[in-house]
Design a protein with these regions (language model features):
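Central helical "cap/lid" subdomain
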Residues: 1-31
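Alpha-helical scaffold segments in soluble metabolic enzymes
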Residues: 2, 6, 78, 137
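Active-site lid/adjacent beta-loop-alpha segment flanking the redox-cofactor pocket in flavoenzymes
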Residues: 10, 25-116
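Hydrophobic alpha-helical segments typical of transmembrane helices
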Residues: 16-17, 75, 105, 150
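C-terminal catalytic lobe of FAD-dependent flavoproteins
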Residues: 37-38, 80-177
């Protein structure tokens, strides 16, 4: 949103930290991604054997990439509740990434009021999974200077026009699940 501000745009986006963790390596035992939707928790095992897991945002705006201890504890508790053997593993490292969150949990894939300036952001937790389809519709938007029919609802003016998307439980409002 700092770059957008330089262009004169005010974006309805908050920046939150999402932490991830990795344990010491163990023999292969988790062959799929394990997720717990109610806790926004996920876990998988890396090729080197470490358990990679994370979940939940810290709950306040920040650009820092270091996590807070209460969230570390909460996410570790989720890991142990699902897979009790995790309590025996040592945590090797953790890191945080910045999530750009919109109030309704849906991204922006659109033109702006500034000529030749387009915006694709506010993906909350879902950006990586949605990249192929959103990239295709965003390319169409840029090439034709008009939104593709599949991304028309992801406009910057949807809040001003009262057209929020009913995507609760994904963005900042995780308690609505």
């Amino acid at each position: 949103s700092h770059v957008a501000k330089m262009a004169g745009l005010r974006l309805p986006i908050e920046s939150h930290i999402l932490q991830a963790f990795v344990t010491e390596p163990v023999k292969p035992m988790v062959h799929h991604v394990v997720s717990w939707g109610a806790e926004l928790f996920y876990l998988s095992q890396s090729d080197k054997g470490g358990m990679v897991f994370g979940g939940h945002i810290d709950g306040f705006n920040t650009y820092t990439q270091r996590g807070q201890f209460p969230r570390i504890q909460t996410v570790a508790e989720c890991a142990v509740s699902l897979l009790p053997f995790m309590s025996k593993l040592r945590l090797l490292r953790h890191w945080g990434g910045i999530m750009d969150m919109t109030p309704d949990g849906a991204p922006f894939i659109c033109r702006t009021d500034i000529k030749n300036l387009y915006f694709n952001g506010g993906w909350c937790y879902q950006g990586f999974k949605a990249t192929p389809a959103s990239g295709w519709t965003f390319a169409h938007t840029m090439a034709h200077d008009e939104e593709h029919e599949l991304n028309r609802c992801y406009s910057l003016d949807r809040f001003a026009k009262g057209r929020e998307l009913d995507d609760y439980g994904i963005g900042n409002w995780t308690y609505k699940q």
